[in-house]
């Protein structure tokens, strides 16, 4: 599991919460105190919860599962994209489209349209069209790429979602809960940690803090993937043995021999 120390969290500003007047009482167990009307998060509470969350992400990846990285607020967009791509997971970093999870079939149709437009750009289809038609198709492609480009290779619903700001991504979290998809999320002092399955009490605004969370999540995915090949090789050996047994069976099929014998008797 990726190791993140309390000192690293302090340096990234993970301990800085929101203004005290905006706090959510459900976060009280994770608040150390206040400084200048800003709540200070107790990192002694954050570290074990952070480790639990990263362990869960790693376990999902080890089982060949998919973790959707989600962060559409400005301070998270670039980091979410970079880290998701680094670990080979889908992401959304521009705007959450309502129904992305609960109406996934329709979303897949939009993704198919995006792939169709991308193919048209490279296979010569666009060259046969007039200029204004090409411009219109490229605008459509760019719009779809911005909203769905990060999930165009996600062929099924994710097994978990990693979220930076639960207030900013409240619609996504509601969809995930409705479908029973586990949510791992950074929860600042102004939100309810009970809304997610794995809450990480911490600053959800500071860029360095966001980078720390996303980098650790990506490392957890990579670690989980690295632990998976042994199980995969065992399954491949089992499939190979089953295939070998299947190839031997047709030569020993008694019914085929009986049918051939009946044919010989008829000729006699």
UniProtKB/Swiss-Prot annotation:
Presence of keyword Ribosomal protein = yes
Q: Enumerate the residue ranges of region (Disordered).
A: 233-268
Molecular-function GO term, any one: structural constituent of ribosome
Which Gene Ontology BP terms does the record give? translation
Q: Which UniProt keywords apply?
A: Ribonucleoprotein, Ribosomal protein
- Any single GO CC term annotated in Swiss-Prot or TrEMBL for this entry: cytosolic small ribosomal subunit
Pfam families given for it? Answer: Ribosomal_S2
Top-level taxon in the UniProt lineage: Bacteria
Q: Which InterPro entries match?
A: Ribosomal_uS2, Ribosomal_uS2_bac/mit/plastid, Ribosomal_uS2_CS, Ribosomal_uS2_flav_dom_sf
Q: Which family does it belong to?
A: Belongs to the universal ribosomal protein uS2 family.
- State what protein this is by name: Small ribosomal subunit protein uS2
Species the sequence originates in: Stenotrophomonas maltophilia (strain K279a)
